[in-house]
Amino acid sequence: MSSTFTDAPDLPLPSSYGDPERTGLGANDLFEGISEHLFFTLGRRVDNASPHDFYLALSYAVRDRLTSRQLASQDALRAHERPRAVAYLSAEFLIGPQLGNNLLMLGIQAEAATALQRFGIQDIEQILALEEEPGLGNGGLG
């Protein structure tokens, strides 16, 4: 019988798991995270990156921070003997753009604005406005 990931002992964590540029909430950490994603994820240098590139790099940097916290929450949940979860899904609720909400939930709106200012982007709203509404249509049913 093959072993599952939960059976495997001492699985290694990615080397960037605790790096501030991946998980830190400060303006410098976000600046480094955005820089890393511009170059390594998007293949862009700062001097030729478009506003959309900065939107994507900021989104990836925020996702890094959310992912590390999500995994910590899952670990805490698994530590309980009988974990329980409640989920609610409404087909009538449109979630809208998420980057601004995620910045708010992490409490890093000002830090993100400061990080973007270091790239010469004075108004974070210009970057947030680039996010498209999630495609949650009703299939023409109403």
Regions found by a protein language model. Give the residues of each.
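A conserved ligand/cofactor-binding region detector
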Residues: 2-142
